[in-house]
């Protein structure tokens, strides 16, 4: 199985030092095409493009200007698993993982990215800000979905083909998973959702759902889950699988 997560806007200022072997992003050449486009943007244009404050726009302007295209794009880079922070990654709590769990995740966990397309946990990336939903004009079209959809879908099919149980587990947000062309997926897709029950009414509360997605990904990686039935046994933070509101392609927890 391959489990998908979204990235995070918030990045750790100092990433965990990981002494084992790391990797380069599979789609680095494509990512550098987007970096070249972003290098041409002014602070004001970056602020407008991503609806950022002046301070954040200046930070990301500097990030793109300092992005080393010619010599070593991996300069000042960190493993994606440890760089991303935020609600999902609090639930994931990768700093507590054992080395063998990280190694397992390298071929069973993926992170969708507006800049890098698709990332494995140990892929080294530079700090950046570029959400998948941004309308950044590029050679493929008017937004990043046009740029990445075919490429990301193809890489997912390639990775799934190497899995013993080729099922795509979607724990990503709607904004990010839209980049996947479901019609072109060659393997089954299962989306997992988390709800809160308030006065007999079910609601998806963003911050709680994000943390739960991270906890589910952690559960799958640390226990080397390889079947849908095992996923249904997840019970962290009181969440339980609810058969009545679920379907073969949508597993819902309350």
From Swiss-Prot:
Pfam families: H2O2_YaaD (PF03883). This is UPF0246 protein lpp1320. HAMAP family: UPF0246 (MF_00652). It comes from the Bacteria. Belongs to the UPF0246 family. GO terms for cellular component: cytosol. One of its GO terms (biological process) is response to hydroperoxide.
